[in-house]
């Protein structure tokens, strides 16, 4: 998002790809639409595929409004994207819309290679240890996910972190909706990071009202600046919380955040 549309366009055109796939989020959808339109004008025969929450739940409107979008995939794309690419490779045009399948997380491979790390040197890398969210906040697209909360195997998670540590990746951001929804699991992961990371910082989001004493204690013992924690309180207005299905204990949140901040070893970002 910090790159200019010109530099993004140039990089995409220079790659000379036949298919361009874009993951669309609230923070990048506008620039993706501009870039996709430009490269389609420059290379009319390419196939442009959109995925991600900002396209999946708004697919009908996007397909009607932007004719440079060839296909939209809603939901989890690991399985369906392979099928779509096979169709394209066979010289067939894919459908304009596909519904992704709920993926068995045990079947997924680690998404990064050594070459990726070299190409993404000094960049933030994203990693997930779980999918889904146990909460149903009215304003969040995660509330529309009916697949529930699912976890990647712990062996997969630890191998992933070891890869990041060995490559000295500066910052890994977890994209888990609520990292601490399973506190025992969160404690095991945090302990592994503390015991093995030498240069890598880890960022994750938590629900502060369900923080356990054990997880707070482990986080308080971490080396300074190893962890960055994001806490989405959103509002302290009780009526507003009720209206959006966030009936959380604000006093509990306040109490737990104070305990987390006491050692001054963790950077905490609290959203209001």
Predicted regions and their residues:
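Short flexible/disordered coil segments
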Residues: 53-62, 87-88, 232-243, 266-272
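Short glycine-centered, acidic/aromatic-flanked micro-motifs in structured strand/loop junctions
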Residues: 22-24, 176-177, 206, 272
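Radical SAM [4Fe-4S] cluster-binding motif and immediate context
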Residues: 110-262, 266
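Short, intrinsically disordered, charge-balanced linker/junction segments flanking boundaries
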Residues: 1, 18, 254, 262-264, ...
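Acidic/polar loop patches that form or flank catalytic/metal-binding clefts of enzymes
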Residues: 93-97, 201-202, 268-270
